[in-house]
Regions:
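Canonical radical SAM enzyme core domain
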Residues: 26-39, 57-106, 113-119, 126-131, ...
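Radical SAM enzyme [4Fe-4S]-AdoMet core and its adjacent flexible, acidic
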Residues: 30-31, 114, 126-131, 138-256, ...
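Canonical Radical SAM [4Fe-4S] cluster-binding loop centered on the CxxxCxxC motif
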Residues: 1-35
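Acidic (Asp/Glu)-rich catalytic clusters
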Residues: 41-46, 72-77, 99-106, 141-142, ...
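Flexible mid-to-C-terminal extensions adjoining Fe-S/redox cofactors in radical SAM and related proteins
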Residues: 268-348
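Hydrophobic faces of well-ordered beta-strands that scaffold small-molecule active sites
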Residues: 5-7, 48-52, 83-85, 109-111, ...
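Short Fe-S-cluster ligation motifs
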Residues: 41-57
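Short cysteine clusters
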Residues: 14-21, 257, 272, 343
């Protein structure tokens, strides 16, 4: 029996098709409360502490989001606070949504920008997204919830970061949050290079781009991450990582005693270690049942887990890395990229 299991069922999908999303862009489903109850019942015998969520892409996307929130609470042994991720799509279409979040005790809500209107709409994959984000910022402040802006940075949008500085200044976000006792936040980063974000590899930032990040955004970012330099936020160049890891003989088990499982609309199950994709698939909950899925997970039988447990780091890196690249990665994100590439190369 595992100490804790968290089950996340992608019941309704997502309104966006974001070009940065590590979870990937897959078709939306329309699963029911009975489906959520089924998923919870399957994993219930295998843990002393079960936590259930009705989403893993867009929170509160379904019209009955409040009922689903209550159902998740009844199916779970723990009740966490609402995530700081909120649905912009819902916020501008449901007059009761922000007030509901406020009553749940939400203090901070994170929103994602990529630059100005055209660029943000492009990366979000939906026209009108930028204007909806700005409207949501106003709604949050009206309800005394502090917005926190996350900015993904690539070569392609680095020159638009000043538009975000102008937005923060024009909307007077720091002072307006301070007025009700809140704190405005903002940070920039490149994210992990998996899912849709792996497609941005050719536009990945290098040390040359870091000098183009405006001082205001640098200051906010260092405060958010508790770091002293942007190098600590964006990581090392691939060339350095390659040099070090290409002689690394270690392997790694990716098994946890408190796993989180993502279940898609077809009831295929994946660990939340990377993009839900074939190399991470543990089985199908309806056809295989939770016991077989847990056996697959605990014994590292998914392709990606098996490779990471049995293949030295150096083999992954030498096979898939670029020894001359100046792209910036955190070590674990880089290893995840190497592992996903290696797995795909094996089956193609």
């Amino acid at each position: 029996m595992l100490d804790k299991i968290t089950v996340c069922l992608d019941m309704h999908g997502c309104p966006n098709r974001c070009r940065h999303c590590w979870l990937g862009n897959t078709p939306n489903g329309r699963l029911t409360a009975s489906d959520l109850e089924f998923a919870a019942a399957c994993f219930r015998p295998h843990t002393a502490c079960l936590t259930v969520y009705d989403w893993y892409r867009e929170p509160d996307y379904s019209d009955d989001y409040r009922e689903r929130w209550e159902l998740c609470g009844r199916l779970s042994d723990t009740r966490d606070e609402h995530f700081e991720l909120v649905s912009v799509w819902r916020a501008v279409r449901d007059d009761n949504y922000i007030d509901w979040l406020k009553r749940l005790g939400l203090k901070v809500a994170q929103l994602t920008l990529f630059g100005g209107r055209e660029t943000t709409d492009y990366y979000t994959g939906r026209r009108g997204a930028y204007d909806e984000i700005l409207r949501t910022i106003e709604l949050l402040i009206e309800s005394r919830i502090s917005p926190r802006i996350q900015v993904f940075v690539y070569k392609d949008n680095i020159n638009e970061l000043n538009s975000i500085v102008e937005l923060i200044t024009t909307l007077n976000l720091v002072e307006r949050c301070r007025d009700f006792g809140g704190e405005f936040g903002c940070f920039v980063h490149q994210g992990s290079c998996d899912g849709e974000n792996e497609r941005q590899y050719n536009s990945w930032v290098t040390p040359a781009e870091l000098s183009l990040i405006p001082p205001m955004l640098t200051e906010f970012t260092l405060k958010h991450f508790g770091k002293s330099s942007l190098d600590e936020v964006f990581g090392e160049i691939e060339q350095s990582l390659y040099e070090r890891l290409s002689v690394d003989d270690t392997t790694e088990s990716l098994v946890s005693c408190e796993p989180v499982f993502y279940i898609d609309r077809e009831f295929d199950v994946y660990p939340n270690l990377s993009t839900p994709s074939p190399q991470w698939r543990l089985g199908n909950l309806k056809r295989d049942g939770a016991e077989k899925i847990l056996d697959c997970y605990l014994n590292s039988r998914s392709l990606a887990q098996h490779i990471r447990l049995n293949t030295p780091t150096r083999e992954l890196v030498v096979s898939q890395g670029d020894p001359t690249s100046q792209r910036l990665f955190m070590r674990e994100d880089y290893l995840e990229l190497m592992l996903n590439r290696y797995c795909r190369a094996l089956v193609n």
